[in-house]
Amino acid sequence: MADSAVRVRIAPSPTGEPHVGTAYIALFNYLFAKKHGGKFILRIEDTDATRSTPEFEKKVLDALKWCGLEWSEGPDIGGPYGPYRQSDRKDIYKPYVEKIVANGHGFRCFCTPERLEQMREAQRAAGKPPKYDGLCLSLSAEEVTSRVDAGEPHVVRMKIPTEGSCKFRDGVYGDVEIPWEAVDMQVLLKADGMPTYHMANVVDDHLMKITHVARGEEWLASVPKHILIYQYLGLEPPVFMHLSLMRNADKSKLSKRKNPTSISYYTALGYLPEALMNFLGLFFIQIAEGEELLTMEELAEKFDPENLSKAGAIFDIQKLDWLNARWIREKLSEEEFAARVLAWAMDNERLKEGLKLSQTRISKLGELPDLAAFLFKSDLGLQPAAFAGVKASPEEMLKILNTVQPDLEKILEWNKDSIETELRASAERMGKKLKAVVAPLFVACSGSQRSLPLFDSMELLGRSVVRQRLKVAAQVVASMAGSGK
């Protein structure tokens, strides 16, 4: 395939805060397109109507733009193969699904959610992986027509071969073989008429002329489904490349519970986008020690997709901090540094809102750093002494911290009102007054017992920062409990 024909895409789902993993995959695709003189396309995959929101879509676009990733086609700029938002393409998919059914490769399934859940529970109890048991495969054409005409809710599933295996070549993993018995009869079209990710993904990649699909290794097991859909439609699949997942230092999967994973966390704390891209780009190149500081153009020059490792890319925040420091000191002139600081401050909602809250709580401007500096620190340096004024034992504080952490994860819209509501409910469940519950949280989030209002502060810090600070506080308090302090 000629380099000029290369077309790659990043296809995030707008269902939450933009993740550094999205930036990682997007950067690979961007560099791949640059290397081959191809096109980098942005597509919004919002088939999950219950979780996708315009607000999250805007955050995704803003985050990728902040990273310095420029796309040739997308929902904001259009292009020859739009629309670039799956919810705007709903009518495009159904004919492809109907073709699969008409050719005998798909079937209508009338199983209720309750019946499917009972099926899965029985399979789990028997020690089997849950997957569809094929009940509706045996329905006659007459019965299917009758139930469809009666308006009975149903989905469309794909048929899977009953024996043998799917063999394919992956750009990273090489030759892969997955037995068909491990592949589920995937839903292609949901009862509401929206396609599932798998169906929309294949159709969109075909219509948008995507030549290479580079995504996380978690999608490797889905390739047999996608190859089957291509075959059922008589289409040529793209080249697949499945990238190793980013991992924590202990080799566990990068998780928001262990490290801040939202791009907004790094923007708010003043990391440079060039440094973050530099850090992520090092996973895709081979360099000698001392050559780590690279611009986007230099990353593109050194980019080599032929030598990707299957080992997990370690997300080492200390290395990111080191790179960010070097970018600030070595890559920015004094004028550029001043301009970056001013731009960061002027565009920083956390700073603006923090100043509003501080105005009625200080008598001199010089008091501001002590009162609001916690909003911008990546590490509070929390020590046991910070909890000295809390009227609770270390064991009681630890119980509070460990209880509220999962409770806060339940919040759908992160704002001070929902935070207060959830913490009041937590206090009630623990049989404690709200004041007793928020006392250790106050220290955990701000590092001090004198600071800005807790609920406002938690909203400004954001979910990922609060999660990280509560985790650190629990570790500090646990050490106090263990030492008898």
UniProtKB/Swiss-Prot annotation:
Q: Name one GO biological process term.
A: glutamyl-tRNA aminoacylation
Q: Which domain of life is it from?
A: Bacteria
Q: What class of enzyme is it?
A: ligase
Q: Which InterPro entries match?
A: aa-tRNA-synth_I_cd-bd (IPR045462), aa-tRNA-synth_I_codon-bd_sub2 (IPR020751), aa-tRNA-synth_I_CS (IPR001412), aa_tRNA-synth_I_cd-bd_sf (IPR008925), Glu-tRNA-ligase_bac/mito (IPR004527), Glu/Gln-tRNA-synth (IPR000924), Glu/Gln-tRNA-synth_Ib_cat-dom (IPR020058), GluQ/Sye (IPR049940)
Motif 'HIGH' region: list the residue ranges: 12-22
Give the residue ranges of motif 'KMSKS' region: 253-257
Q: Where's it found, cell-wise? A: Cytoplasm
Which parts of the sequence bind ATP? Answer: K256
Q: Which GO terms describe its cellular component?
A: cytosol
Q: Which GO terms describe its molecular function?
A: ATP binding; glutamate-tRNA ligase activity; tRNA binding; zinc ion binding
Quaternary state and interactors = Monomer.
Matching entries from NCBIfam families are given as: gltX_bact
What is the protein's given name? Glutamate--tRNA ligase
Q: Which organism is it from?
A: Rhizobium meliloti (strain 1021)
